[in-house]
Amino acid sequence: MYHIIINPVGGKGESQKALQTVKKLLDAKKVPYIVHETQHAHHATEIARELSREPDTKIIAMGGDGSFHEVLCGIENFENVTLGLIACGSGNDFIKKSGHPKDVEKALDVILKGNVGYVDYMDLGTTRCLNVAGGGMDVDVLVKYASVKKLKGSAAYNYALIYTLLHTRFHKLRLIVDGKTMDKSVFMIGIGNGGFIGGGLPICPHAEVSDGKLDVVIVNEMKKRRIPSMLLKFLKGKHVEDKTVEEFRTDRVIIEALDDSRFELDGEIIEDRYLDIKVVPNKLKMFM
């Protein structure tokens, strides 16, 4: 039995199209399944929590990084659960590093073949993160995007991006790594299990989802006239070669906002201004 968890209105209608494809294929193969449609924010977490209490539970999470995040946060007993991913959300960044197919039929085929592997995730005490925890410019864009009322979809996001770049600011953060405290003024920071954000921006290009490490990339304050060229480097994952950028691996990092900066986990803005992030290596069992 497969338990499908899906946001029925997610992905600008793509979730429903993908669900119909999956149901048709499963019905043709006479594979038993139950569809759990989420009704409100964090409902996927509640559903996953209940399902994970039963042994040999096969969960198919359908959606984007936010949906995968919610399902991960709900798992109580990792030994009971094997998780399959079908990406059909507005942001599908985790699969760019995990190797899961983007095509719905191919992703389902991976699940039905039954081959499993284990991936890392990030533990923050009260929550978890599968892909990237971030701060700085990308969060400023998300905050502005959430406030745009007259535009929708990509038009709203592009407006938020342009607005943020025209009003660039740097963020005062404190990091503690391996007992060393560092106060930074940053343009952007990414702490990655996966490596991509924003639908394809490789902020942590060297991250691997099963290496037992967090990849930390810090883009430090720079002259504002350099920002356009830095963004071009971002598109190719070449920003880590720039002298203003620091990149290192660790198994734990503490990050604290020293100003009004906010953070995001898997593309979702959070209110916490102090994050204690630890990698949990090879814990999450997935169809791969």
Listing of model-derived features with the role each one plays in the protein:
Residues 1-59, 73, 180:
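ATP/NTP phosphate-donor binding region
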Residues 29, 77-187:
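Catalytic core of DAGKc-family lipid kinases
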Residues 67-79:
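Short Gly/Thr/Asp-enriched flexible loops that form oxyanion-binding sites at enzyme active sites
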Residues 134, 138, 190-203, 269:
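Glycine-rich phosphate/pyrophosphate-binding beta-alpha loops
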Residues 149-156, 205-225:
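Gly/Ser/Thr-rich active-site loops/lids in small-molecule metabolic enzymes
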